[in-house]
């Protein structure tokens, strides 16, 4: 039940668990549907006979309604058109008998039909692959469905178009013979024209486009479809969200978690730095300003810390000259807002101190060494007064520990467990990979936190006192992983990328890795072998033998997150990039 949209566009649709669509707005428009079968009309709001899953392309949501004789399937996507977007909706009749499809348009306004085009005020609203046989107008969902039920089904299947008095709510009735499909293109943005259905992108085209976006970032390959579905849905959700304004409904979440910074962190951690940069700019520019006193709000301080985090993942050649004026002004306001020395100890200065350190690192990166040195000297004086130099990053609990990050998500989901597992998190998501929170069909806080815990569970990066970067792989390993092959590709690390694969020789895991970075690194796999580490950028090793639980096979064989285990003698351990 994801929120649907495309990159580079502000339109987002809600798709609920029954396949109904909502266009949010001051007066939300809604599209519901029904099937006229041999026995009666079946409407999407009834829900009892409806199931949802992800299509075979691993992206598109597939909704099935059971009627006598088989299923009527629905697929829906938002597709690009002329720099904007339209919604593509398809119904397919898998039964051996003809049916009728009702498309209920609520709050759309009075419609007119001209062959296969439905218009409002002379502008096309819907283009269809078939001509509707009947137009029924009414007042609200219940009145519309009552009128549909009272219409003669045989007339709907055979008669010419008939209608009654126009109103803001209406229903289009289409015939749908067996093994045929009905395609609709719906106007999202008050466009003057709609594309030809025959020339519009297919659902597989849309899926391939999203897969290419995913492949530009970090990839994790396992044999568990649930994990794949939730990962794809979460990444797609935040990529779409990066084009939404900060004040939009998308980011309006009832949560104490900093939703926009979390989303930017997740996008960076998965290699989608362009989308993350775009989102940080919007967040930075949306921060409130106070013209009458020197003060810096929390959002601005978070933005400083996000830019510091961004430097870890961006190219060393990348220029950030367009934020230097903002950095200088923010630092000036931040220093001016600090209390006098005698009051420094009485106030929690953690976020301010961390933000100053972030500003120093950013200025150093941008070759503003004089400013960076001046700021460093002032920071030393402040730290001497408050008597502490240990100030954790505001994002530490989301990025630095798999155990802490999964506890954070568990708390957000109100899961009361002492030792939370990934299986328990995945069980909260529905078959489409999304998770309903309140009135939202998909929750951006969950999307961001989930991506961050999976990143931490498969690859973590920390800075050692020696200056080396420590990279820990397979932090989420437990004994249910014995015999399970995994593969990680294109994981962003400091000034580079890394990939690794684990394959098994009996109960001993073999680790293969390759890190493409100029930074000194130390790689370890503490959950698999506490004593092993390597400073090599490329290598392979056989880690210590794992001792399975005595009851592991009988209890966990069918419920493990990663079900399809690799035989010890199998050569198919996978490769990585």
Where in this protein do the model-derived segments appear?
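Amphipathic alpha-helical scaffolding segments
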Residues: 108, 189, 278-286, 325-329, ...
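The core hydrophobic/aromatic register in alpha-helical repeat solenoids, strongest
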Residues: 132-136, 142, 267, 307, ...
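Substrate-binding groove/exosite segments of carbohydrate-active enzymes
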Residues: 160-166, 209-313, 317-320, 392-426
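The feature captures the catalytic groove of carbohydrate-active enzymes
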Residues: 166-200, 294-298, 321-383, 505-507, ...
């Amino acid at each position: 039940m994801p929120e649907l949209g495309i990159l580079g566009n502000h339109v987002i649709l809600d798709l609920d668990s029954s396949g109904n669509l909502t266009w949010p707005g001051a007066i939300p428009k809604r599209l519901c549907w029904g099937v006229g079968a041999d026995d009666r009309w079946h409407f999407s709001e009834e829900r009892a006979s409806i199931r949802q899953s992800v299509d075979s392309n691993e992206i598109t949501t597939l909704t099935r309604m059971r009627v006598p004789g088989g299923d009527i399937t629905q697929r829906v996507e938002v597709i690009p058109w002329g720099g904007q977007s339209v919604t593509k909706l398809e119904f397919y009749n898998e039964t051996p008998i003809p049916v009728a499809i009702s498309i209920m348009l609520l709050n759309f306004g009075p419609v007119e039909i001209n062959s296969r085009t439905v218009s409002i005020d002379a502008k096309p609203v819907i283009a269809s692959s078939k001509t509707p046989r009947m137009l029924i107008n009414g007042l609200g969902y219940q009145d519309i469905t009552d009128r549909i039920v009272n219409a003669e089904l045989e007339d709907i299947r055979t008669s010419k178009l008939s209608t009654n008095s126009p109103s803001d709510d209406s229903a289009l009735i289409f015939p749908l013979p067996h093994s045929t499909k009905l395609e609709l293109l719906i106007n999202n943005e008050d466009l003057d024209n709609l594309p030809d259905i025959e020339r519009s992108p297919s659902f597989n085209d849309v899926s391939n486009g999203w897969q290419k976006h995913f492949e530009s970032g970090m990839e994790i390959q396992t044999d568990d479809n649930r994990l794949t579905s939730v990962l794809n849905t979460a990444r797609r959700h935040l990529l779409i969200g990066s084009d939404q304004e900060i004040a939009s409904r998308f980011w309006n979440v009832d949560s104490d978690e900093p939703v926009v910074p979390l989303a930017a962190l997740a996008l960076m951690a998965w290699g989608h730095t362009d989308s993350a940069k775009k989102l940080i700019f919007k967040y930075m520019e949306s921060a409130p300003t106070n013209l009458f006193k020197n003060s810096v709000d929390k959002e601005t301080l978070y933005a400083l810390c996000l830019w510091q985090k961004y430097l870890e993942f961006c190219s060393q050649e990348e220029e950030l000259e367009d934020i230097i004026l903002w950095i200088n002004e923010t630092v000036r306001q931040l220093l001016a807002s600090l209390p006098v020395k005698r009051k420094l100890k009485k106030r929690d200065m953690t976020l301010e101190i961390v933000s100053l350190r972030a500003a120093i690192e950013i200025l150093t990166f941008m070759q503003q060494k004089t400013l960076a040195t001046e700021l460093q000297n002032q920071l030393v004086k402040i730290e001497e007064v408050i008597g502490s130099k240990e100030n954790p990053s505001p994002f530490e609990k989301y990025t630095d520990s798999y155990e802490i990050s999964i506890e954070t998500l568990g708390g957000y989901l109100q899961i009361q467990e002492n030792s939370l597992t990934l299986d328990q998190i995945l069980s909260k998501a529905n078959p489409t990979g999304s998770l309903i929170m309140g009135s939202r069909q998909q929750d951006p806080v969950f999307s961001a936190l989930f991506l961050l815990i999976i990143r931490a569970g498969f690859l973590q990066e920390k800075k050692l006192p020696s200056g080396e970067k420590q990279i820990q792989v397979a932090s989420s390993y437990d004994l249910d992983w014995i015999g399970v092959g995994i593969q990680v590709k294109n994981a962003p690390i400091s000034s580079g990328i890394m990939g690794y694969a684990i394959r098994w020789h009996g109960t001993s895991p073999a680790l293969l890795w390759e890190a493409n970075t100029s930074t000194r690194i130390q790689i370890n796999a503490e959950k698999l072998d506490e004593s092993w580490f390597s400073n090599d950028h490329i290598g392979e090793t056989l880690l210590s033998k794992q001792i399975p639980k005595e009851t592991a096979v009988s209890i966990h064989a069918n419920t493990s997150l990663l079900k399809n285990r690799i035989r010890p003698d199998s050569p198919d351990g996978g490769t990585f990039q």
